[in-house]
Amino acid sequence: MGNLARFGVSLDQDLLEPFDELCRRKSYPNRSEAIRDLIRKALVEEKWNSDAHGAGTLTLVYDHHKNDLSRRLVQIQHDDHDLIVTTLHVHLDHYNCLEVLVLKGEPKRMRALADKLIACRGVKHGTFTGTTTGEDLA
């Protein structure tokens, strides 16, 4: 962190009390660190709405014995291979697999890929989380 700038924040007590509780639950050492995280989150969301590059993770849980699901998932991934940095495949039990894809690229394309994979028949659960590459973020 470069030069620190101090500024005052005025909040209604009805907003401050739950904020302080949030800070305690999340183990923030002080309000300033919590506010910095909130600002970073807003900046990342703003960047995601632009055409800037981002990163993300896609987590899928599926039964690999279902139909032709494994082949379909791999085929879809190959169609957008330039977005996929790496994958992790875990056998949860005899039937269920957990697959984690680390993505990097244009947010719209990453979201579209995630939507395609999550929508495949046989995928039991899927979650996409977008984030920043860290550029231009203090």
Curated annotation (Swiss-Prot):
CDD domains: RHH_NikR_HicB-like. Signal peptide: none annotated. GO terms for biological process: response to nickel cation. Transcriptional regulator. InterPro entries: Acetolactate_synth/TF_NikR_C, ACT-like_dom_sf, Arc_rbn_hlx_hlx, CopG, CopG/NikR_regulator, Ni_resp_reg_NikR, Ribbon_hlx_hlx, TF_NikR_Ni-bd_C. The keyword Transcription applies. Belongs to the transcriptional regulatory CopG/NikR family. Binds 1 nickel ion per subunit. Ni(2+) binds at H78, H89, H91, C97. Keywords: DNA-binding, Metal-binding, Nickel, Transcription, Transcription regulation. One of its GO terms (molecular function) is nickel cation binding. Its cofactor is Ni(2+). This is Putative nickel-responsive regulator.
